[in-house]
Amino acid sequence: MAPKAEKKPAAKKPAEEEPAAEKAEKAPAGKKPKAEKRLPAGKAEKSSGEGKKAGRKKAKKSVETYKIYIFKVLKQVHPDIGISSKAMSIMNSFINDIFEKLAGESAKLARYNKKPTITSREIQTSVRLVLPGELAKHAVSEGTKAVTKFTSA
């Protein structure tokens, strides 16, 4: 194998050329000097832009949560009560868990019936299978009400 070429240190940027002592001298007598901009350790090493186009920022991964909806329901039911961030996180995990169970059960039902599409009928049946007793009845009635409101609008 051929020996790898030595890496050259990255050229100094204009902001880094002046030492901090010189910047302090330029500052007015009563004020503190402005802090220098520094790159995080991981970004300073990757300044050459290997593998990615230079200048392009990495897009933030959007994280979808039910937090705002949980808060709205809480305020409808108990307007005077708040919720801690840990309790909110637990509620969000709970809703995600129920959603995954319902989606999995609906997918199974669609496969059993050799249907390529999950319809409201599969969702309703999966709600009856996953949720216990009275909770399933209330969920089905609220779901039916929501679907009729959606189709009529």
From Swiss-Prot:
SMART domains: H2B. CDD domains: HFD_H2B (cd22910). Disulfide bonds: none annotated. SUPFAM superfamilies: Histone-fold. The keyword Acetylation applies. InterPro entries: Histone-fold (IPR009072), Histone_H2A/H2B/H3 (IPR007125), Histone_H2B (IPR000558), HISTONE_H2B_site (IPR055333). GO terms for cellular component: nucleosome; nucleus. Belongs to the histone H2B family. Core component of nucleosome. Nucleosomes wrap and compact DNA into chromatin, limiting DNA accessibility to the cellular machineries which require DNA as a template. Histones thereby play a central role in transcription regulation, DNA repair, DNA replication and chromosomal stability. DNA accessibility is regulated via a complex set of post-translational modifications of histones, also called histone code, and nucleosome remodeling. This is Histone H2B.10. The lineage of its organism: Eukaryota, Viridiplantae, Streptophyta, Embryophyta, Tracheophyta.
